[in-house]
Curated annotation (Swiss-Prot):
Signal peptide as annotated in the record: none
Membrane found in the keyword field: no
Role, per record: Ribosome-binding protein that promotes ribosome hibernation, a process during which ribosomes are stabilized in an inactive state and preserved from proteasomal degradation. Acts via its association with eiF5a (eif5a and eif5a2) at the polypeptide exit tunnel of the ribosome, preventing mRNA translation. Plays a key role in ribosome hibernation in the mature egg by preventing mRNA translation, leading to ribosome inactivation. Ribosomes, which are produced in large quantities during oogenesis, are stored and translationally repressed in the egg and early embryo.
Taxonomic placement: Eukaryota, Metazoa, Chordata, Craniata, Vertebrata
Keywords in alphabetical order: Translation regulation
Subunit structure: Associates with ribosomes; preventing translation. Interacts with eiF5a (eif5a and eif5a2); preventing translation.
Similarity comment: Belongs to the DAP-DAPL1 family.
InterPro entries hit by this protein: DAP1/DAPL1
Descriptive protein name: Death-associated protein-like 1
Gene encoding the protein: dapl1
Any single biological process term in GO: regulation of translation
Length: 113
């Protein structure tokens, strides 16, 4: 049997609770903690959990819309749309305003020479 050698990276000291920054191209770049493999399944799991309730919500919304549509049809027979338009129009005045002509004030001023 062959012995397997386990390669371990040297332990890095944490500074202020996170890994130290690495210099790349003259600028400091911080390293991200954690494995990228672990984060991908969590995102997928969240999406699947969100899809299931949304389909149930869509069905309840559709049922509510059907109920509302039926009620709106009943209301349209009882209260026609023309009556609603008349109710929202601006009322006409019974007596028209008489607009008096403005007075012209002539101010006499000396002429310019």
């Amino acid at each position: 049997m062959a012995k397997e050698l386990k390669v371990q990276s040297p332990p890095q000291a944490l500074k202020a609770g996170h890994l130290p920054a690495v210099k790349a191209g003259g600028m400091r770049v911080s390293k991200k903690q954690g494995n990228e493999e672990n984060t991908a399944p969590e995102k997928n799991a969240k999406k699947t959990l969100q899809e299931k309730p949304s389909s149930v919500l869509n069905m309840t919304k559709m049922q509510a819309m059907n109920i509302l549509a039926g009620e709106l049809e009943k209301l349209s027979h009882d209260f026609p749309g023309e009556a609603a338009q008349i109710a929202h129009k601006k009322p006409r005045p019974t007596v028209e305003k008489i607009i008096l002509p403005k007075r012209l004030y002539i101010i006499q001023q000396p002429r310019r020479c």
